[in-house]
Amino acid sequence: MTTIAKILAREILDSRGNPTLEAEVTLDDGSFGRAAVPSGASTGTKEAVELRDGDKTRYLGKGVRHAVDNVNGTIAETLKNFDAADQQGLDRRLIDLDGTENKGRLGANALLGVSLAAAHAVAASRKQPLWQYLSTITESDVALPVPMMNIINGGAHADNNVDFQEFMVLPVGCSSFSEALRAGTEIFHSLKSVLKGHGLSTAVGDEGGFAPDFRSNVEALDTILEAIGKAGYTAGEDILLGLDVASSEFYDNGKYNLVGENKRLTSEQFVDFLADWVAQYPIISIEDGLAEDDWAGWKLLTERVGKKVQLVGDDLFVTNPKIFKQGIDSGTANAILIKVNQIGTLTETLEAIAMAHAAHYASIVSHRSGETEDTTIADIAVATTATQIKTGSLCRSDRVAKYNQLLRIEQALGSGARYAGRDAFVSLKR
């Protein structure tokens, strides 16, 4: 039986040393599922609410005891004897129980922990790996996603003068996920050598990428190209580049303030700036190229480079199907970043991915800068029509855990394992 016998939550630590919530669901047959909730550093203003205690005398106000109490009290009582195999019904019950648009009463962290743990428990009850169980919900063909490997950190993820938050390599020319992971790892180590040779720091940021104090943003791109060549790969063929501009972080009074470039640009000027980069470098993906409230700028960027480059809405869409529909209807961007904690339940996460697929938008399953050893997002990426995954660099166990899970899944699939590769960019095929 997949009816819920017990729900239990606790406060644990994430990769930045901040508290987060972990939930466990036990079923009547003794099957058990556990999930930990991630947390972001740069967050969209329309994200579901992560409930924090606010008590400055404890964990500097970042404790999650209230969210834990909500799980162990109201949620556990309401869902006792509920059939966890009814994922949609369970998530609807959680949403109704919270009763707010942004999940601010019980906390999106409380709802998400239970939602994901329930899926783990049902998979265990059916003696299936999570990705296989989820694929029965999504009715999707399974595939190994292209990893978007964040090897240089800037912005809110590092203490340096780099404005852009992430510089990524995408090994699209590899024949398998395991080969793609090897390529990324070799480039990562090559980059460390290049940075040392330039007398730059090899300290890493929140997501495991290096965080050197470059003189400008473009210097980061040039250094990555050098590292790709040194590792024996060809940029533009084997390896493409991706950016997370996270432009909401430096958007102020209608201008984009680039400290690294000593420039203050209008939306039109910043679109020109990004378009010039696309013309000069093998860039295939730009995330949050414009600020989340600059819809006119987004429209302009989409018209300018949207047929050549994947334009990913993160802060723009916050994994919210209602907001995402506005983007689809207006032809804004051509891809969506999927973060489970931005929306707060598994069902809504899967709904956003399905919406993207129907609209020929690409979807990228993503971690957060505050992560744990939880690997759920790896299984979600395989079991859905998402063709890419963002889960950080090639160091820090909270990032590598997801890559290792994907290696396990690839091995389990055997000859049936398919790597998305160049086919990952579905929005550029229309």
Swiss-Prot record:
InterPro entries: Enolase, Enolase-like_C_sf, Enolase-like_N, Enolase_C, Enolase_CS, Enolase_N. It comes from the Bacteria. It holds the Pfam family Enolase_N. Keywords: Cytoplasm, Glycolysis, Lyase, Magnesium, Metal-binding, Secreted. It is an enzyme of class 4 (lyase). Mg(2+) binds at residues 244, 287, 314. The active site is at 207 (proton donor), 339 (proton acceptor). (2R)-2-phosphoglycerate binds at residues 165, 339, 368-369, 390. GO terms for biological process: glycolytic process. Pathway: Carbohydrate degradation; glycolysis; pyruvate from D-glyceraldehyde 3-phosphate: step 4/5. Its EC number is 4.2.1.11. Its cofactor is Mg(2+). It catalyses: (2R)-2-phosphoglycerate = phosphoenolpyruvate + H2O. One of its GO terms (cellular component) is extracellular region. NCBIfam families: eno. Catalyzes the reversible conversion of 2-phosphoglycerate (2-PG) into phosphoenolpyruvate (PEP). It is essential for the degradation of carbohydrates via glycolysis. This is Enolase. It comes from Xanthomonas euvesicatoria pv. vesicatoria (strain 85-10). The gene is eno.
